[in-house]
Amino acid sequence: MASKKLKYKTDFDKCVLTDNFAARGWTRCGDKDDDDWNIYWATVWNVRNIFNPKSGIRLNDMQIINHFPNHYELTRKDLMVKNFKRYKKELEKENSPYCQKDENGNYLYLDFIPQTFTLPGEYSLFVEEFHRNPNATWIVKPASRSQGKGIFLLRKIQQLKKIGGGTNSNPLQAFSLKEAYVVSRYIDNPLLVGGRKFDLRIYALVTSYRPLKVYLYAMGFGRFCNEQYTQDIAEMDNMFIHLTNVAIQKFSDKYSEKHGGKWSLQSLRYYLEMVYGTDMANKCFDDINNIIIMSLKSVQSIIINDKHCFEMYGYDILIDENCKPWLIEINASPSLTVTGKIDKELKTELIKNVYQIVIPDDWNDDSSKTGANTSTQTKVGDFNILYDEAQEKKISQQQQQQKKNINSKTIWK
């Protein structure tokens, strides 16, 4: 263990955080204004304040914090879409191999976000697409809210009056610019288990953006709706059918406190193997890995890569009936509230592993080990390295050198 007891600060009184701090013998800062901490698990608002140049706060080499300064470039729904569209154009311009398409003209590696428009900026584009597919269902979400708040399904343009006022001819005429929205093509053919819709919550830990280094947690889970899935228009407003958020589902009469409407990721993978076969299940999870890497790369150049920062993202992935995964959203502050014994065990181990990566046991013994990206391990608990750009470049350089040596031997034999 570290030779000196470390101090922590947290804005969240969640047992999975505080119990893990206590287990490592760390001391909690007693006052909310106490800045003598080594690790701070903060709200996104306090992180923004800390990195605001006007705050006058300067973190020292022995301080790390759980968000990058402009994390919202990835975790705000509208900015996530905007940044990925920009990144896709950059790859196309470079004629990147990631832009390969199948025989139907669909991207092999970049087609994982449902068609999405931002409102009010892309309202006209949305209307054009809406009229091209008049029978499609769309889902409308506030860009910066979470836990399913403010979400509704849409089949008629006039339904946008819910968020913008306006008239039937122009529902966004009086749209408030105080809050942005996204409207996405609703995935109306989700894979069902027992007739119910579900999505996956998968955790990814980023310790550096340049070079990109990301760990993937093996023990995610599926979140289930409590009601049987249907496309019946009469049930469009029934969020117990359409939204998997626990914050929504816990109000259903069918909600179980025992399991919290969750299945382990391993159980869901076994289910996929049983229904689709091992090869398709493996491809599905390979595609999920690709989604995580490509989404992070889409903001790699614009995230402020402060060495004091790390970020644990909660990815929400929906699998359709063709075993194709779709990225629904990325959460900067995935819920650490526990919904039962198994959920508590999973999240306790999750946070324990995060601490082991960002502050390894020798972190305080070695003055050269500062910042959140000091661990050299490829596996820590249930976290495994998903992508290590520095290592990838090193291997690439070694392969290029080997190729040069081979060429030299061929020429000078």
From Swiss-Prot:
Protein localization: Cytoplasm, Cytoskeleton; Cytoplasm, Cytoskeleton, Cilium basal body; Contractile vacuole
Binding, ATP: 184-187, 197, 199
This protein's GO CC annotations: ciliary basal body; contractile vacuole; microtubule
Molecular function in Gene Ontology: ATP binding; tubulin binding; tubulin-glutamic acid ligase activity
EC number: 6.-.-.-
Keywords for this protein: ATP-binding, Cell projection, Cilium, Cytoplasm, Cytoskeleton, Ligase, Microtubule, Nucleotide-binding, Vacuole
GO biological process: microtubule cytoskeleton organization; protein polyglutamylation
InterPro entries: TTL/TTLL_fam (IPR004344)
Ligase as UniProt keyword: yes
Domain (TTL) ranges: 2-370
Function recorded in the entry: Probable tubulin polyglutamylase with a strong preference for alpha-tubulin. Modifies alpha-tubulin, generating side chains of glutamate on the gamma-carboxyl groups of specific glutamate residues within the C-terminal tail of alpha-tubulin.
Name of the protein this chain belongs to: Probable alpha-tubulin polyglutamylase Ttll1
